UniProtKB/Swiss-Prot annotation:
Pfam families noted in UniProt: YgbB
Catalyzed reaction equations: 4-CDP-2-C-methyl-D-erythritol 2-phosphate = 2-C-methyl-D-erythritol 2,4-cyclic diphosphate + CMP
Keyword Lyase: yes
Protein's recorded name: 2-C-methyl-D-erythritol 2,4-cyclodiphosphate synthase
Biological source species: Chlorobium phaeobacteroides (strain BS1)
Coiled-coil stretches noted in the UniProt entry, renumbered to this chain: none
Keyword Metal-binding: yes
């Protein structure tokens, strides 16, 4: 049994879609990034890669590569899931938290969980997504950006 953690932060930017957990959320701003900047999927990807000692998201999908420009992070997460399986691991569970003031994401959490589970070919009961604010403190409180934290458990696949 192995545990991994992941953290990601993205700044808000004009003229971008806000995509979190593979869900497009109506908002006046999106997140700045080389890919679609899905902060939640990036944190989960890092947690999974870390648990398997496979490096981090930047190693596998460098932001200097045109191949990953504006790529859907669901594709990246699906690739991470395949890497985990190829290393002989199965995902036990994923727990994650979004840290953002606005917009409220509670109405979208079930869709996010479903997207993550489908992408990784695991049961949705193994995926938790929560959301919180910073009570108006710091860059999140000033609505300058969004953070996501994730932790996961992976286990050796039974032969």
């Amino acid at each position: 049994m192995r545990i991994g953690t992941g953290i990601d932060v993205h700044q808000f930017a004009e003229g971008r879609k806000l995509i979190v957990g593979g869900v497009e959320i109506p908002h006046s701003k999106g997140l700045k990034g080389h890919s679609d900047a899905d902060v939640l999927l990036h944190a989960i990807s890092d947690a999974l890669l870390g648990a398997a000692a496979l490096g981090d998201i930047g190693k596998h999908f460098p932001d200097t590569s045109p191949q990953f420009k504006d790529i859907d992070s669901m594709i990246l997460l699906q690739h991470v899931g395949k890497l985990i399986a190829e290393e002989g691991y199965a995902i036990g569970n994923i727990d994650s938290v979004l840290v953002m003031e606005k917009p409220k994401v509670a109405p979208h959490i079930m869709a996010m969980r479903g997207n993550i589970a489908a992408c990784l070919d695991i049961d949705v009961s193994k995926v938790a997504v929560k959301a919180t604010t910073t009570e108006k403190l710091g860059y999140v409180g000033r609505e300058e950006g969004v953070a996501a934290h994730a932790i996961c458990l992976i286990e050796e696949r039974k032969q």
